[in-house]
Amino acid sequence: MDLKKSSTKKIVLAGGVFDIIHPGHIHTLNAAKALGGVLVVAIATDKTAQKMKKRPPLHNQELRRELVSCLSMVDNAIVGHEDNIFETVKAIKPDIIVLGYDQIHQEQFISDGCKRINLDVEIVRLQSPVPHLSSSEIEKKYGKDIHGL
């Protein structure tokens, strides 16, 4: 998917599970959108989401992609590649990769991986716009009740 052909604006790539969309996601995606002009969001596959969260996601990857694609700041939502984030990066060819404050990826790891695939990408780590608001915090507060919905 080469979005550069259709746009002179910078392409920003953000990623995540997005199983329980909350105001922290909205603020983060708005901040990501403000860095460029085209915001592409890569949704973690079900397998990756389960590895990251240590439980199956509430919604499957296609439903999560559909939910995120409905957000006004998102120009394109895709399901990411399994087990290799750089396959997704190579397909999108972003100018900027945005990392949320709570994402496990280190900037240097992303930078080194992009260099290996010959992409010159700016890495930006966003700070939490809504302190102490994350899917994990919501899950801690409501526990198993949220999974019984």
Language model segments and positions:
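Nucleotidyltransferase catalytic core that binds NTPs
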Residues: 1-149
